[in-house]
From Swiss-Prot:
The keyword Glycosyltransferase does not apply. This is Probable sugar efflux transporter. InterPro entries: MFS, MFS_dom, MFS_Efflux_Transporters, MFS_trans_sf, Sugar_effux_transptr_put. The chain crosses the membrane at residues 15-35, 50-70, 81-101, 103-123, 136-156, 170-190, 209-229, 246-266, 275-295, 299-319, 333-353, 364-384. HAMAP family: MFS_SotB. PROSITE patterns: MFS. PANTHER family: PURINE EFFLUX PUMP PBUE (PTHR43124), SUGAR EFFLUX TRANSPORTER (PTHR43124:SF4). GO terms for cellular component: plasma membrane. It comes from Shigella flexneri serotype 5b (strain 8401). The keyword Glycoprotein does not apply. The lineage of its organism: Bacteria, Pseudomonadati, Pseudomonadota, Gammaproteobacteria, Enterobacterales.
Length: 396
């Protein structure tokens, strides 16, 4: 009995460590959103110009997720995790030392390489290492790590940047990654590659219209979100005219609301996943359309941020659960594609927000983001009516 208890405890420790790693990887992806103004000031650039860093990072992840996953498909997973963490940490040291914006972008590309591999294997590893009968809870823990990156990681990164400089934010993330790496080395057993799929999996996946429709929905809705979210920090300060501290509080509120979204999805996701996702997309559409009108009041912006955060967490969880349900025979390939497609949306949204801010007005980012959000809402209704049984039954 003791051995059983210990083994379950170790299994949960492994999953928790992976969740911490997910927190760190998501924090470093999101944290520049809260540091754009400081980085721009440091390199004497416009905030919108610095924002292109978000697009470069996201599109490198999108471009490299599948190739890297296929290149490493036969690599033992413990060794692979150690290698990608070394690249991740070294790249953050370079971010800390970066003497020009170009060097900073190069360091972020290194982080993106590690990111591309990490997110293509994490969900399947969490499922493998979970105690018997606890796969859903293991995935929920990974999702919680992701949510906490929004709740704690991004605001804390911004606070560190405000008081100690943006370089210290990246350095602190590197230190956190080093501690996590040491834990992974101690806790993880040898993990031979399993169910990783190969190029042979691609035609099979591409012949699944329900899966392809989910991928298309993902890229459109993520583009909508990041058109506005990428520039929310300068929007709050320069358009709404509120303080830097309020911008930090707003990011904390938006991220914290994601926990509520996670709880809602956890309670209702198995039975009503499609309805939840469509409702969340409708909520996102309303939030984006009301972003500028709400900018006249801190309370209005705060309330809007809560609903925005809830909506995006439900959307993110819903998309991931459906992808895993529709591709159980090639989870790594399917998740690599999902990670790549998600990041195409991030990069596209950040680029649209960048162009709107540079050539039109930053005040319009909400209205522009509402356009793809409306398209995503219509598409979600169409595909969930077209494949209601497939998606809901397999999700359960």
């Amino acid at each position: 009995m003791t051995t059983y208890t210990v083994s379950r405890k170790v299994a949960w420790l492994r999953v928790v460590t992976l969740a911490v790693a997910a927190f760190i990887f998501n924090t470093t992806e999101f944290v520049p959103v809260g540091l754009l103004s400081d980085i721009a000031q440091s390199f004497h650039m416009q905030t919108a110009q610095v924002g292109i860093m978000l697009t470069i990072y996201a599109w490198v992840v999108a471009l490299m997720s599948l190739p890297f996953m296929l290149m490493t498909s036969q690599v033992e997973r413990r060794k692979l995790l150690i290698c990608l963490f070394v690249v991740f940490i070294a790249s953050h040291v370079l971010s800390f030392l970066s003497w020009s914006f170009t060097v900073l972008v190069i360091s972020r590309i290194g982080v993106a390489f590690a990111h591309a591999i990490f997110w293509s294997i994490t969900a399947s590893l969490a499922i493998r290492m979970a105690p018997a009968g606890k796969r859903a809870q293991a995935l929920s823990l990974i999702a919680t790590g992701t949510a906490l990156a929004m709740v704690l990681g991004l605001p804390l990164g911004r606070i560190v940047g405000q008081y100690f400089g943006w370089r210290m934010t990246f350095f602190a993330i590197g230190i956190g990654a080093l501690v996590t790496l040491l834990c992974l080395i101690k806790l993880l057993p040898l993990l031979p590659s399993e169910h990783s799929g190969s190029l042979k999996s691609l035609p099979l996946l591409f012949r699944r219209p329900a899966l392809m429709s989910i991928y298309l929905l993902t890229v459109v809705v993520v583009t909508a979100h990041y058109t506005a979210y990428s520039y929310i920090e300068p929007f709050v300060q320069n358009i709404a005219g509120f303080s830097a501290n309020f911008a930090t509080a707003l990011l904390l509120l938006l991220g914290g609301a994601g926990i509520i979204g996670s709880v809602i999805f956890g309670k209702l996701g198995n039975q009503y996943a499609s309805a939840l996702v469509s409702t969340a997309i409708a909520l996102l559409l309303v939030c984006l359309a009301l972003l500028l009108p709400a900018a006249n009041s801190e309370i209005h912006l705060g309330v809007l941020s809560i609903f925005w955060g809830i909506a995006m967490m439900i959307i993110g969880l819903g998309m991931q659960v459906k992808v895993l349900a529709l591709a159980p025979d090639a989870t790594d390939v399917a998740m690599a594609l999902f990670s790549g497609i998600f990041n195409i949306g991030i990069g596209a949204g950040a680029l649209v927000g960048n162009q709107v801010s540079l050539h039109w007005s930053m005040s319009m980012i909400g209205y522009v983001g509402a356009v793809p959000a409306f398209a995503a809402l219509i598409w979600s209704i169409i595909i969930f009516r077209r494949w209601p049984v497939t998606l809901e039954e397999q999700t359960q």
